[in-house]
Amino acid sequence: MSSIKETAARFFEVCEAGLGWSGCRQHCHPDATFSAQAHALAGVETLEAYTEWMKGTFEPLPGGTYELKAFAVDEDRHNVTAYGVFSATHTGPGGPVPPTGRSIEADYVYVMEFDGDRIRHMTKIWNDTFTNEQLGWV
C-alpha cells in the first residue's frame, strides 16, 4: 500500500464513522480545503468544517453506515478517489423536520488531493437533493 492510499483509507474510515476533526486531523493539512456542488454543504469550505458536519449527521441519522464500493489511487495526480454508499434512517432528533423514519442509500464520491502524505483538499460529489427527498426533508 502506498502512503497516500493508507492515509486516505484511514481518513475515510474515521470521517464516515462521524468522529469529526479530532479523528481526522492527523490525516490532513491543518488548513485543508473542501468543496462540493451540493446545497446542503454551501459555505463548508474547509475539511475541518466538513468532518464536523459529517459528525453532526449522526444525530438525526444514528447508526449510519457506509459500504465502500471502489477505492483508487492516481499516483501521477497525487490523489485518491473513494466511492461509497451511505445508508441511514432518520430516527434521531435534528434535521429540518421531526424524525421521519425514512431511510437513505446515498451514493457519493470523495476525491482526496494530497500534498506530501496528507490531504490538502477534498471534493465531495453527491446529489444532496435526492438524499433529502429520500429522507422526506423536502
Describe each PLM feature range.
Residues M1-V138:
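C-terminal and inter-domain tail/linker signature
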